[in-house]
């Protein structure tokens, strides 16, 4: 009798578990989708909230875009090209007035000096790791630590 009751309880539990929907990402995090304008191929590889409320997004293809009012109506978000021609940027972070971008071969400091919304000053902050050109080599950056330092994680083959 006890074995039958145990089996019945186990079967009922398994049936309930099967009936429950598999969890999805939105069960844990709020997901906001931003419509990407025609002509932009977005392979998002880094995001950073800027002090002025814009959202900086970099693409693995080498562009950085600024999105205005990212918390507003998604259909009214304006995209503007901030920088282009970067080498597989995989991180963005803002620190001390500079937008830092970790590219395949360097950590770059980027700034819009003349205030026109486009980056016009690019400075190498660090490039001490070197690359061979192998397609599996990537550099991933972190947010600045307590000392303001960025740590670079390398995938070298």
Residue ranges and their predicted role:
Residues 20-157:
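Beta-propeller blade termini and top-face loops
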């Amino acid at each position: 009798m006890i074995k039958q009751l145990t089996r019945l309880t186990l079967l009922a539990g398994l049936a309930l578990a099967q009936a429950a929907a598999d969890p999805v990402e939105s069960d844990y995090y709020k997901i906001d989708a931003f419509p990407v304008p025609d002509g932009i191929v977005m392979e998002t590889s880094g995001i950073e909230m800027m002090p002025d409320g814009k959202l900086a997004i970099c693409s693995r293809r080498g562009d950085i875009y600024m999105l205005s009012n990212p918390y507003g109506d998604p259909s009214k978000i304006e995209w503007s090209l901030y920088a282009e021609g970067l080498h597989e940027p995989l991180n963005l972070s803002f620190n001390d007035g500079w937008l830092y971008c970790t590219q395949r071969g360097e950590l770059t400091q980027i700034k819009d000096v003349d205030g026109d919304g486009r980056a016009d000053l690019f400075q190498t902050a660090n490039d001490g790791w070197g690359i061979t050109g192998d397609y599996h080599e990537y550099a991933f950056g972190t947010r600045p630590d307590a000392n303001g330092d960025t740590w670079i994680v390398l995938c070298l083959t």
